[in-house]
């Protein structure tokens, strides 16, 4: 009878299965060695956040193996042995615990080696359509692909995911290639060369499973040379109905993420109920998860109706000058010198109520002493604004009154807890008109203050510090969204960081690219230049096209002149460094003019007036 220890231990297949962590590490090593180190102009996104590039792998060595063993000799086994003999990959293979994991890594590495064969119809490139300032990997076709044809070597490896791995991915908030199996109804992790295929609402390819661990891309329509190979990620992958999608199809149709941003109309205060703290916190949490360029969201329509926004509006539009008569104020001030009268209970209650109401609207500490010159109008003036009649008791109160106010605002409860318990004597009362021109200040100082000068100064500093932090405004005003315009990622000044950076037109594929430190203009874009360095031909040619093809393959890329000749350089205009707003890279979109409507109208008027003057002069001479 078997022992309990053997019975409780998992099976060998379950213990040694290909997991998500293992496949992610294999893919990071393979992309680092065969994509980033193969004359690639940028680094691809890795699955592990703390991945460090391997040492012992040189770009020239990788390109030499790919050219001689893969492209010319078409010997994948020899190329695999040469690559695994490099010090970086050799050390990684030595760290693998058993032969089964070594076989998994070799099998996954072979998928990246195969995509450099001459009959491969695609290659890896980059695009900045989604983020403008950052380039992401994409798949571009370099051969014509018929509809229904399986795209050769554009494949990947599938790994089923567990509940723990799903939760781990949610916590890390990383964008992984996760596909849903239609038969098993379980999510699977998908990595390989096909993971670089981006989403498109009208995709020209689809993902098809091959066996238990394989995935292949099949063309759903004809794909032409230079066209990006895309697949569909799902209906609600980028929001509800893909409302945040930035694919090429949505760009051409100017919809979803490319739709013009229409600001919502401000709603009336009476029809919109006030939002409580729970609703406001929930909306702010939801908006933080949204992308910045999301179109019409709920947080935008509800933000202008919060009570904090109304409080700020009342404080800015105080009309003290129109409510308070300066004559009445002057007669009330001109009184014989003597002990100042004390406000009665009703007046004190009115003053306290007005103070509490204004504090709820403005979030200002009521227990602090008189505000400085840059403070807003007094709370008594706000009370006089609400009531049509202004009395002496509510607008001007004596300074020797001890007022004790209990703080009810949650935001400033911690700062004012020590001050709200003590009785503070107001030293002065200043009345200031709401107009900005010729402000009149009326001060009443009857009794000296009982507080020390140091405490008053510290209280004023605390008040200024609390007023200097616009906490309420941050919770009300939503973050400004990035409105995308079709073609805003091409020939834009956002990518020209240095003085000599400029946009250059490729002489091979006629695509615009950014050349850094363009003292001499390059002839080709990074994709076409990398292709010629690896294959020895101009893009998209990879091999001899027949027996009559006499073009020789360049085996040493250093013998090719990569810049324009002086006579060609003289024809290049360096004005504005190639920046042109509104120019789109797709021929389907009409190129809008760079002038505004007003300037076009002015040009028409200038032409019309000039033609009239010329006609009048001709009539006079005839």
Swiss-Prot record:
Biased composition range(s): Basic residues: 608-622
- Compositional bias, Basic and acidic residues, is annotated for 590-607
Any Pfam family the entry gives: SET
Q: Could you cite one Gene Ontology molecular function of this protein?
A: histone H4K20 trimethyltransferase activity
Enumerate the SUPFAM superfamilies for this protein.
SET domain
GO BP: methylation
Q: Where is the SET domain?
A: 120-234
* Polar residues composition bias: residue spans: 265-285, 427-437, 446-458
Which reaction equations make up its catalytic activity?
Answer: L-lysyl(20)-[histone H4] + 3 S-adenosyl-L-methionine = N(6),N(6),N(6)-trimethyl-L-lysyl(20)-[histone H4] + 3 S-adenosyl-L-homocysteine + 3 H(+)
Under which EC number(s) is this enzyme classified? 2.1.1.372
Q: Which GO terms describe its cellular component?
A: chromosome; nucleus
List, as start-end ranges, the regions of compositional bias called Low complexity.
376-394
Q: Which domain of life is it from?
A: Eukaryota
Report the InterPro entries cross-referenced here: Hist-Lys_N-MTase_N (IPR041938), Set9_fungi (IPR025783), SET_dom (IPR001214), SET_dom_sf (IPR046341), Suv4-20/Set9 (IPR039977)
- Which family, according to the similarity comment? Belongs to the class V-like SAM-binding methyltransferase superfamily. Histone-lysine methyltransferase family. Suvar4-20 subfamily.
Known function: Histone methyltransferase that trimethylates 'Lys-20' of histone H4 to form H4K20me3.
Q: Under which name does UniProt file this protein?
A: Histone-lysine N-methyltransferase set9
- Species this protein is from: Aspergillus fumigatus (strain ATCC MYA-4609 / CBS 101355 / FGSC A1100 / Af293) (Neosartorya fumigata)
């Amino acid at each position: 009878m078997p022992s309990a220890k053997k019975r409780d231990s998992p099976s060998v297949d379950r213990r040694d299965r290909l997991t998500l962590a293992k496949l992610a590490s294999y893919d990071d090593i393979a992309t680092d060695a065969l994509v980033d180190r193969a004359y690639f102009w940028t680094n691809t996104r890795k699955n592990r956040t703390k991945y460090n590039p391997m040492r012992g792998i040189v770009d020239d060595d990788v390109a030499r193996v790919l050219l001689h063993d893969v492209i010319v000799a078409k010997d994948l086994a020899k190329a695999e042995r040469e690559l695994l003999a490099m010090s970086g990959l050799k050390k990684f293979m030595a760290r693998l615990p058993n032969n089964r994991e070594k076989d998994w890594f070799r099998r996954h590495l072979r998928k990246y080696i195969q995509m450099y064969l001459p009959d491969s119809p695609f290659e890896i490139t980059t695009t900045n359509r989604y983020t403008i300032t950052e380039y992401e990997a994409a798949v571009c076709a370099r051969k014509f692909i018929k509809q229904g044809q399986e795209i050769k070597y554009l494949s990947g490896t599938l790994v089923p995911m567990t509940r723990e791995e799903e939760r781990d991915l949610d916590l890390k908030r990383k964008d992984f290639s996760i596909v849903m199996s239609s038969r098993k109804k379980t999510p699977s992790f998908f990595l390989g060369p096909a993971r670089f295929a981006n989403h498109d609402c009208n995709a020209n390819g689809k993902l098809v499973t091959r066996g238990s661990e394989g995935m292949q891309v099949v063309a759903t329509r004809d794909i032409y040379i230079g066209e990006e190979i895309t697949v569909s990620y799902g209906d609600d992958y980028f929001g509800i109905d893909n409302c945040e999608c930035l694919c090429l199809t949505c760009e051409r149709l100017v919809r979803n993420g490319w739709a013009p941003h229409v600001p919502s109309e401000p709603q009336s205060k009476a029809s919109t109920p006030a939002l409580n703290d729970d609703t406001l916190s929930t909306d702010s949490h939801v908006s933080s998860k949204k992308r910045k360029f999301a179109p019409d969201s709920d947080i935008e329509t509800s933000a202008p109706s919060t009570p904090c926004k109304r409080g700020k509006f009342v404080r800015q539009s105080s009309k003290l000058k129109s409510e308070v008569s300066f004559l009445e104020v002057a007669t009330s001030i001109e009184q014989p010198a003597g002990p100042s009268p004390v406000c009665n209970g009703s007046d004190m209650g009115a003053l306290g109520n007005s103070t509490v109401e204004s504090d709820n609207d403005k979030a200002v500490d009521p227990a602090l002493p008189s505000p400085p010159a840059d403070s807003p109008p007094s709370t008594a003036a706000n009370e006089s604004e609400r009531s049509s009649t202004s009395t002496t008791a509510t607008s001007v109160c004596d300074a020797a009154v001890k007022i004790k106010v209990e703080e009810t605002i949650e935001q400033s409860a911690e700062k004012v807890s020590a001050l709200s318990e003590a009785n503070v004597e107001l030293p002065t009362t200043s009345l200031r008109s709401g107009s900005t021109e010729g402000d009149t200040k009326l001060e009443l100082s009857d009794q000296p203050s009982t507080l020390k000068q140091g405490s008053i100064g510290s209280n004023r500093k605390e008040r200024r510090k609390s007023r200097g932090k616009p906490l309420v405004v941050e919770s009300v005003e939503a973050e400004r969204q990035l409105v995308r315009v079709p073609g805003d990622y091409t020939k834009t000044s956002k990518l020209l960081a240095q003085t000599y950076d400029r946009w250059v037109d490729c002489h091979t594929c006629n695509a615009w690219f950014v050349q850094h430190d363009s003292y001499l203009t390059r002839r080709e874009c990074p994709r076409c230049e990398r292709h010629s360095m690896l294959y020895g031909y101009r893009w998209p040619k990879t091999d001899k096209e027949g027996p009559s093809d006499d073009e020789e393959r360049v085996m040493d890329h250093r013998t090719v002149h990569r810049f324009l000749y002086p006579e060609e350089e003289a024809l290049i205009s360096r004005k504005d460094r190639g920046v042109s707003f509104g120019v789109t890279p797709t021929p389907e979109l009409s190129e809008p003019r760079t002038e505004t409507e007003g300037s076009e109208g002015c040009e028409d008027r200038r032409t019309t007036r000039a033609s009239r003057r010329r006609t009048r002069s001709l009539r006079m001479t005839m």
